[in-house]
Amino acid sequence: MKAHEVNFDGLVGLTHHYAGLSFGNEASIQHRFQVSNPRLAAKQGLLKMKALADAGFPQAVIPPHERPFIPVLRQLGFSGQDEQVLEKVARQAPHWLSSVSSASPMWVANAATVCPSADALDGKVHLTVANLNNKFHRALEAPTTASLLRAIFRDAQFFAVHDALPQVALLGDEGAANHNRLGGDYGAPGIQLFVYGREEGVDTRPVRYPARQTREASEAVARLNQVNPHQVIFARQNPDVIDLGVFHNDVIAVSNRQVLFCHEQAFAKQGELMRQLRSRVAGFMPLEVPAREVSVQDAVATYLFNSQLLSRDDGSMVLVLPQECREHAGVWRYLNALLAADNPISDLRVFDLRESMANGGGPACLRLRVVLTEDELRAVNPAVMMNDTLFSTLNDWVDRYYRDRLTAADLADPQLLREGREALDTLTQLLNLGSVYPFQQEGAGNG
């Protein structure tokens, strides 16, 4: 059955700031306390969405979350009216304010893991929300992510959205950032590659930085998503590259159809994995980048592999890259050699995503890939699909509500909280989502 890969991109939130919250993510730590520009960040993301939609790649948007997230501050013992809660936490424990104000939900590659209907035992599209257990600021995301996904994929005839796994380290799950699908046409059954960094009872793990994904979590997600057991491979990421800042697999590898574009040091037992994929994926084409041409450190600094690999109708592929790749002589030289070589990649598209990149999120972090048949695509909430009208509407919305300068100190401003809630209230109407945010549900309950 004919199917399309639809990229659902996260819209950057109003509290986008640089707080260095993500240990193991080198860009996040490096840019701590830099002044951010939320308006520019949102517009950079929207420009990528629109450019890809205009190029014929189906594109949709996933809204930001409610931030600062007051309910969690109340759970941590801060009381009073919302404005009083903000004032108390800013004075007594400002690090909590930064955590509950993170705009990290923009990186929707971590929102969920997706199973297309062609791979599912029950023939539905499955999405299992990621618990993001390894980082406090990200572990807050799961309930709102589930609400948003259910408002977008609302037809139970076609879609099943599963809540996140229990919030324990044993079941740490980072979503689609540690998941790749390989095969032929999107609508045909494919092989799902789940990548993990640690496993209970196995000592081989990184030393410097945490391995966020467990094998136990990957196996549970595959079960929840009803992936046909004959179409699954579980592979361990090389712990040495995690220690070099490869905190998700999508920082060192990206797949599309029969192609796996990755660094030669991406996986533990990489030769064995490539043999397995060759035997199970017809026409499998690994594009393994040698360390002598691009080091792991340079791949992390430029986010070469945090790119999007997209298929055109003629079978050729486009590699969507951050501007940092073009600015690095060695990486750009490699990419031009790749373009000239015998493989499906026929075009490089470069985008300026500096606001997201400075927090450690490139093109691939910003998108959740969902393979949909024509019928399934028609069942998606149409208001989230990117087109000329939505692009214009969202740019106007950003201009109206977003600040062009934000520091950690600004997070205590009660006006920022009010601006954010008003903005999201408007957005839920624009995107026909209903009351998906806790502040909207509280308002309804108190009325």
Curated annotation (Swiss-Prot):
Q: Where does substrate bind?
A: 19-28, 110, 137-138, 212, 250, 359
Query: What EC identifiers does the entry list?
Result: 3.5.3.23
Catalyses which reaction(s): N(2)-succinyl-L-arginine + 2 H2O + 2 H(+) = N(2)-succinyl-L-ornithine + 2 NH4(+) + CO2
Give coiled-coil spans as residue ranges: none
Into which EC class is this enzyme placed?
A: hydrolase
Q: Which Gene3D superfamilies match?
A: Succinylarginine dihydrolase
| Biological process according to GO | arginine catabolic process to glutamate; arginine catabolic process to succinate
The Gene Ontology terms for molecular function here are:
N-succinylarginine dihydrolase activity
| Pathway of action | Amino-acid degradation; L-arginine degradation via AST pathway; L-glutamate and succinate from L-arginine: step 2/5
Q: Which domain of life is it from?
A: Bacteria
- Which residues of this protein are catalytic? 174, 248, 365
Swiss-Prot/TrEMBL keywords: Arginine metabolism, Hydrolase
Q: How does it assemble?
A: Homodimer.
The UniProt function text for this chain reads: Catalyzes the hydrolysis of N(2)-succinylarginine into N(2)-succinylornithine, ammonia and CO(2).
Q: Which PANTHER family match?
A: N-SUCCINYLARGININE DIHYDROLASE
Q: Which family does it belong to?
A: Belongs to the succinylarginine dihydrolase family.
What is the protein name given in its UniProt record? N-succinylarginine dihydrolase
Q: Which organism is it from?
A: Citrobacter koseri (strain ATCC BAA-895 / CDC 4225-83 / SGSC4696)
